[in-house]
Every structure is written in C-alpha cells, then in structure tokens.
C-alpha cells in the first residue's frame, strides 16, 4: 500500500502499530497479488492524499469502492473521467442542481471537491472486482473509523454528511459540538426520493462554513 506523506501520516501512526493493521496490510497485499482489486493500489489512499487533515471542511462517507473496471480511484462516489456517472452520483447532482443551481456535468470526477477540503471517504478502501463488499470486515472499517475520530477531535468546525443507514452509524464516533452533522437517506435510486432530494445539505454546509469564517465549497463540477 502506498505511503501517506502529508499531515495524516503522523496522526495515523498509532494505527499502523496495531495488530489489526498488520493483518489488514497482509490481506490487502495478498488480494492484489491474486485477484483484480480496485482501486489501483496507488490510489487506495487518494482521499487522504488529496485532502490533508488541515484542509478538511466537509466529510462525505461512502461504503466501499466501485467494483467495475476503471471506475474507482480512491474517492467515494467519484469515478474516473470517461465513465458514465453512476446512479447515486446522478442523484447527488440533481440535488445540487435543486439546492444551489449547479448544472449537471458530463462526468463523475469529484477531485475538485477533494482539493477544496471535502474528504470523500469510503469506510472500506478496497474491493475485489465485480464483488461488492468483498473486503468488508478485514480491518478497513477500524482504520477509517480512526480517521473519523481524528477529525472529530479537531478543534474547528467540520461538516459531516451522513447519507443512508450505514454512514449514519458513524454518528456514534462524533461528539464534538463544534461540528455539524447532516443526515439524509442514501442518494441511491432506491432511497433518494425518501428524503435525499430536498435535504439541501450542500447549501447548509456552505452556510455553516461561512458562519464560522471559512470559505464555502464550490460544488460545481465542470464539464470535461
């Protein structure tokens, strides 16, 4: 697995010393040697590479990476250029259009958000090709919970967007009154109409950031 070189490195050092991480490291290494695994190994930690801790303003939590070829690149909900926009992200774009008037772009590449401080964190950071959730229960959840804990302890306001029951379980890790926790159903076509549409999380996040002296996020993804 690639090394993390920014300010996450020191904060995550205690995790690397724990027995679960050694097991996780060995499991992931073996999986990449035997199977097609997504994302490519160099992209596993892109959420952390693109969004240093000091820059984190918003956290969006996903479950595990896309499991088809050339989609996943280490940011939840995001796909590499050249892919069709997945259904959940299409619904995120619809809500952005309704909430902030953002036009719906022709791609699903969300690095622009990550570069502005939106941590796009999957709870599980790898997956076997064509086999959703195949790497669940091997230690990634403990590692990404540690990331959430680190952000929770930050003495500055951060917005957490928790979409769907899986992400909302993470509320038990969040007890810092400085932060804003926004909850809605998942943007999946199965649940978006039950309250994701109309949640206005993006404007709520920006209003909170502005109220706390931070620059808002430019949520508009440009056409490629």
Name each region found by the language model.
Residues 2, 7, 14-162, 166-169, ...:
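A polyanion-binding, active-site-adjacent surface
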């Amino acid at each position: 697995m690639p090394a993390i070189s920014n300010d996450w490195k020191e904060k995550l050092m205690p995790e690397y010393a724990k027995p679960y991480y050694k097991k996780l490291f060995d499991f992931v290494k073996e999986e990449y040697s035997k199977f097609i695994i997504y994302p490519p190994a160099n992209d596993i930690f892109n959420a952390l590479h693109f969004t240093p801790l000091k820059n984190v303003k918003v956290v969006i939590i996903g479950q595990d990476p896309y499991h088809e070829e050339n989609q996943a690149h280490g940011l939840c909900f995001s796909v590499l250029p050249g892919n069709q926009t997945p259904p959940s992200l299409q619904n995120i774009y619809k809500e952005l259009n309704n909430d902030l008037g953002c036009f719906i772009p022709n791609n699903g590449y969300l690095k622009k958000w990550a570069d502005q401080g939106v941590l796009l964190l999957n709870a599980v950071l790898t997956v076997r090709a064509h086999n959703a959730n195949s790497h669940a229960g091997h230690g990634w959840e403990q590692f990404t919970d540690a990331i959430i804990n680190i952000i929770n302890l930050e003495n500055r306001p951060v917005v957490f967007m928790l979409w769907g029951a899986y992400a909302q379980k993470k509320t038990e890790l969040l007890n810092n009154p400085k932060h804003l926790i926004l909850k809605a159903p998942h943007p999946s076509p199965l649940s978006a109409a039950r309250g994701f549409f109309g949640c206005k999380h993006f404007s709520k996040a920006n209003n909170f950031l502005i109220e706390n002296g931070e620059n808002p996020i430019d949520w508009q993804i440009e056409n490629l």
